[in-house]
């Protein structure tokens, strides 16, 4: 150790020979003190001083170390106090200062560094205690080295080697600010929080509609706040510019409750179009995850906004197949968007049909009377009154006349309300209603491709649209063309004028109307003999000749028409036997046979 030869060379102009000669002549004892000070060997340090009275405790020697403020290594001139401060040797440092024979502000070599410079550049574990001891020994923190750096300036360069708490303490000690004053300032900075005045108009985010599930899932931190004055964002249920709690509307943006991995890294390139949740609020307030788990604090939860249920009755049901939450009954009852309006509500259009919602058709829920009530009330297009009147068909006119005879006039129908509809139309037999709802009934109607399945109107009236669609379809044009051969004088036939003699817009194959059709056909055959008629009649010269219908009607129609009329009069028990007449098909076949003959 002491006196041993070294092959290391100095970083200065000293050559190896000169360094070894100087060390062997003058610095042998000083080098031993530096080694004892670096190892914090107080007993050896004392023995060396006591055995060699000529050795000064403040004697400098060359020590191989890193230059202060630099990364270069070399032999630098240091005192035992500087080496003890550099390596954090507490016992040796206290002993040297206690002797009073060492200057804590001594400057060595051309670097002009002090013990404080060495203590800061050493970055030892006990750097704070070392600096306190030196400052208590009247060390000056304002001493400047050859590069113009104070000890506190060296801390900024070597701060990565010092723990955060130690760095702050060293900075406080070297800047001359007492710890108590600094602590008071830190407490003041922590206590400086923006306090807003009490705002009575600011709603409570946990009371009323603001605490419901629907508001939390679809409106909380989604809708922008309309308050122009400054207020506490944490107490406001609406979103503000630059707020981290901002959420996307899950009804507008189809994203899931799964956190976005890109958003966690900083920013998502997809923005609002991302299919994952951006942030904690979007993830836990998503309808698929909100209040699907119990809070660990349950009823003792003190959070302002909690994503979990505090009681079991607050848990939202989870779909077993998808794993996501379903609409809670409390939310569906409170939200007007989840409610379904009744089709019998006059003056408004129904949102969903009863069949779509799975509600069976019955007279009490308005399924059988939906078409009739809709014809009396404005449709969803809100057409004006004149256009509605122009769309009334002849069947509606006939129904009005029949209702007048039966005591159900327009005034009574006009006063229909949801309160008295059940009294007016509540006389259906339950057996007939079940027959109308049976699958065989629908399958029987579905085999007619040209007529849609419609519900029969009340009071035994047959559906005009179902019969007209079956008879007056593509074959009506063939009837019009082939009937021209039976006219004495061929005239261009206008299919649009082929109607009932009373001039109504549409008509069904009823018994009384067939008689009218028979008379109108005879007028077309015998010519325009208007003198034999006691009153002016309509000119039927342009209508097609349908005289061949007479024989067909006499042979086939009366029996079947009588049978259908009888079934109609019998009441609602025979409505399940409704089907399109087959005599129309037989009429077409017989007519073609006559043409071929």
Curated annotation (Swiss-Prot):
It comes from Arabidopsis thaliana (Mouse-ear cress). A zinc finger (C3H1-type) spans 254-281, 289-313. Keywords: ANK repeat, DNA-binding, Metal-binding, Nucleus, Repeat, Stress response, Zinc, Zinc-finger. GO terms for biological process: cellular response to hypoxia; defense response to fungus; regulation of DNA-templated transcription; response to cold. PANTHER family: UNKEMPT FAMILY MEMBER, ZINC FINGER CCCH DOMAIN-CONTAINING PROTEIN 29. Its main location: nucleus. It is found in: Nucleus. Expressed in roots and anthers. It holds the Pfam family Ank_2. This is Zinc finger CCCH domain-containing protein 29. SMART domains: ANK, ZnF_C3H1. Residues 320-337 have a biased composition (Polar residues). Residues 320-341 are annotated as: Disordered. The keyword Nucleus applies.
């Amino acid at each position: 150790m002491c006196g041993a030869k070294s092959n290391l060379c100095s970083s200065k102009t000293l050559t190896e020979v000169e360094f070894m000669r100087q060390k062997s002549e003058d610095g042998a004892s000083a080098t031993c003190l530096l080694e004892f000070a670096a190892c914090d060997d107080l007993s050896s340090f004392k023995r060396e001083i006591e055995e060699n009275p000529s050795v000064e405790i403040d004697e400098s020697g060359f020590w191989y170390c890193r230059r202060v403020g630099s990364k270069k290594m070399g032999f630098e001139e240091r005192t035992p106090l500087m080496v003890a401060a550099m390596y954090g040797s507490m016992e040796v440092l206290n002993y040297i200062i206690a002797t009073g024979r060492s200057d804590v502000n001594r400057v060595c070599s051309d670097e002009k560094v002090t013990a404080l410079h060495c203590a800061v550049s050493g970055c030892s574990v006990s750097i704070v205690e070392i600096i306190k001891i030196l400052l208590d020994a009247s060390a000056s923190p304002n001493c400047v080295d050859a590069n113009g750096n104070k000890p506190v300036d060296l801390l900024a360069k070597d701060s990565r080697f010092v723990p955060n708490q130690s760095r702050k303490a060293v900075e406080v000690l070297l800047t001359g600010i007492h710890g108590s004053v600094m602590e008071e300032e830190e407490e003041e900075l922590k206590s400086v929080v923006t306090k807003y005045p009490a705002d009575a108009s600011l709603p409570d985010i946990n009371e009323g509609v603001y605490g419901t599930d629907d508001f939390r899932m679809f409106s909380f931190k989604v809708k922008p706040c309309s308050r122009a004055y400054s207020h506490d964002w944490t107490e406001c249920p609406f979103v503000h510019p630059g707020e981290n709690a901002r959420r996307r509307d899950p009804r507008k943006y189809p994203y899931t409750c799964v956190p976005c991995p890109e958003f966690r890294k900083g920013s998502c390139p997809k923005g609002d179009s991302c299919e994952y949740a951006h942030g904690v609020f979007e993830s836990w307030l998503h309808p698929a995850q909100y209040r699907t788990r119990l809070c660990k604090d349950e009823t003792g939860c003190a959070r302002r906004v909690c994503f979990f249920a505090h009681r079991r009755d607050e848990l939202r049901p989870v779909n077993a197949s998808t794993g996501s939450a379903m609409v809670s009954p409390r939310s569906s009852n409170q939200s007007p968007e989840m409610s379904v309006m009744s089709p019998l509500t006059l003056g408004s259009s129904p949102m969903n049909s009863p069949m779509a919602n799975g509600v069976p058709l019955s007279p009490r829920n308005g399924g059988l009377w939906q078409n009739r009530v809709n014809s009396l009330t404005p449709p969803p297009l809100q057409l004006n009154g004149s256009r509605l009147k122009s769309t009334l068909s002849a069947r509606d006119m006939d129904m009005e006349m029949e209702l007048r005879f039966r005591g159900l006039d327009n005034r009574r129908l006009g006063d229909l309300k949801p309160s008295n509809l059940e009294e007016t139309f509540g006389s259906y037999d339950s057996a007939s209603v079940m027959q109308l709802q049976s699958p065989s009934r629908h399958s029987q109607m579905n085999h007619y491709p040209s007529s849609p399945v419609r519900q029969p109107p009340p009071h035994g009236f047959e559906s005009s649209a179902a019969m007209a669609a079956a008879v007056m379809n593509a074959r009506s044009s063939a009837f019009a063309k082939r009937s021209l051969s039976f006219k004495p004088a061929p005239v261009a036939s206008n299919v649009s004028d082929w109607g009932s003699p009373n001039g109504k817009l549409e008509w069904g194959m009823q018994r009384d109307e067939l008689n009218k059709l028979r008379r109108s056909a005879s007028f077309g055959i015998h010519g325009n003999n208007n003198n034999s008629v006691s009153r002016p009649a309509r000119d039927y010269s342009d209508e097609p000749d349908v005289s061949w219908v007479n024989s067909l009607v006499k042979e086939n129609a009366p029996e079947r028409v009588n049978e259908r009329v009888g079934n109609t009069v019998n009441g609602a028990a025979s409505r399940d036997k409704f089907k399109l007449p087959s005599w129309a098909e037989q009429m077409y076949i017989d007519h073609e046979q006559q043409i071929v003959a």
